[in-house]
Amino acid sequence: MVYENTDVAISQRKDFLTNNNIGICDIVASATRKKIDASDIGMEDVVLRDLISVLEKYPKVTTLLFTGGNSKNGPEYFFRRYLKQYGISLTNISSEVPRIHEVILPKSLRKIKTVSLIAPSGAANRAVGSLQKYKEMKLKYPSKTTIDFRVEQYKKHF
């Protein structure tokens, strides 16, 4: 794929997602920022998308991949906050990174798995660098980077 911000690149990404039955849906429907940047922490006045309705509408969805964790304004954090409206919570399946949980939808009683992948941002490099699995990879393959670690993590879930 071409990694540019062009019509060709966008078309390639759309085709990839469609061909692999992958949907994208941001949990944040709207937010404001005082400082224009990409950080999650900078979001204010956050309105969350009604993901329960989205999940009930699309019964083929079995897994949600969060690109970020449970830190303030991260996707898992917002999803947990959103679920409280329904009186439901995530059930822990694995505490290892990436953390895996499941939730049972209130209407259909269908199980949805959630996987909290490490964020792709440069700011997440400190967190990656502190992980034991990253340190083990680095000892075995010194030329590998935090991005390589994320790619390996992402591959298992895509």
Where are these regions (language model features)?
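C-terminal capping/extension of enzyme domains
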Residues: I36-I52, Y77-F158
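Surface-exposed, flexible loop/turn segments at secondary-structure boundaries
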Residues: T32, K72, G122
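Short, well-ordered beta-to-alpha junction loops that form the rim of enzyme active sites
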Residues: F66-K72, A119
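Short secondary-structure capping micro-motifs at structural edges
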Residues: A9-K14, L48-E56
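Short, surface-exposed acidic-centric catalytic microdomains
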Residues: M1-M43
